[in-house]
Amino acid sequence: MKRLLFFLICVFFSKTSYSNVDISINKGIDISTPIGISSFEWVEVNENNNYENISKIISCDLQNSGKFSPIEIYKESNKSIEKQIKNNSINLNKLNINTILTGKISLNYNGEYLISYKLIDLVNYPGKILLSGYRTVHLQSFRKVAHEISNEIFKKLTGIQGVFHTRIAYILYNKNNEYKYKLCISDYDGYNQNIIHQSNMPLMSPSWSPDGKKIAYVTFEKGSSEIKIKDIKTGSIKHISSFPYHNGAPAFSPNGENLAFALSKTGSLNLYVMNLKNGYIKQITHGNSNNTEPSWFPDNNSLAYTSDQSGTPQIYKINISNGKFNRLSWLGSKNQNANVSPDGKFIAMVNSEKKSQHIALFDINMDNAKIITETFLDEAPSISPNNVMIIYTSSYGDSSVIELISTNGRFKTSILKINGQIKFPAWSQKI
């Protein structure tokens, strides 16, 4: 069994090495609410060519959500845009937008930058300021500030909390490096990448703690699989599980009190839950079928998981208190790797049919599913903490990509591209 598991892992990562990360934005596939984003105006100071373009970052954030279609307003328009609104002389039909964001950047006496911004209504109450604010920051914090402004705009216009400041985790593989496997975290859009752990042996399945301070993962550094939890800030590592055969698929409960995972110590893969305070482990599933890939529902008492008890992999739901379970997925021949949305209303999963493998969404209340991706060999969906976006991996020849798609299907983009393997993306759930 050890040899088989190691073979499967090698196949999973059996592509060429990766190079520098590339960030790219692709065209949307539907119409969203238009919003004007003007270039931030530099006031009484020459524009710093090394700064992060705040308006561009905000545009990308809002577009990634699938709820907005940003329209760039260039500098020559920006200088007079507020005056035109005030004088009611702006051509609304030409701009075709409901709101517009304007901003200014100036340098204060201690060398910090003052960034001010306004979100202005152009339709209901033309000229009314819907949102305004300012930040005093150093140059290296421009990207962070841009994400914060995006969050404010998104919340103001949709009523939904923005998550553009959140982070993702993933595994990189490069067979030519000293350390072939790297557990990394970055901003949700792929920027500011940091290596959290690296090894010559496989690393798999990162899972964030709800507070965003720790990551559970699977390692083979001692020759067989183990589950560990690493504190991101201190670097301390806590051992969780190293039973015979396979230890895998860790998943923190939403309240952070328990960790679900899969063990094959009795022969078949079954689900277990550990109380992280006292270390007590409870077996959840039983029998000869393979049960793995747990994902928590927000009630902290139910899990979605993959089981082959019907003959092919399908998604099931189980109550961890009484053991009652039922099948959820019926789309096509195979469904696996479920990720339950934070609000518990839908599940993202991998659907396989003949030679295709795509991400599908299963609406729990409506009891129906639909395929939302068209990329190649789509895997490992992870839903944003506000239920608006999904990241997943796909393959393009020898390259591996983290894709982002809005749950409404209106926009998709590639956020991380490498010439090699990138696997197991996981979106932090801390807002």
Swiss-Prot record:
Q: Which keywords does this Swiss-Prot/TrEMBL entry list?
A: Cell cycle, Cell division, Periplasm, Signal
**Which Pfam families has this protein been placed in?**
PD40, TolB_N
Give the superkingdom in one word.
Bacteria
Q: Please state where this protein is localized.
A: Periplasm
**Signal peptide (UniProt feature, chain positions):** 1-19
Keyword Cell division applies:
yes
Q: How does it assemble?
A: The Tol-Pal system is composed of five core proteins: the inner membrane proteins TolA, TolQ and TolR, the periplasmic protein TolB and the outer membrane protein Pal. They form a network linking the inner and outer membranes and the peptidoglycan layer.
Q: What's this protein's name? A: Tol-Pal system protein TolB
Origin species: Wigglesworthia glossinidia brevipalpis
UniProt gene name: tolB
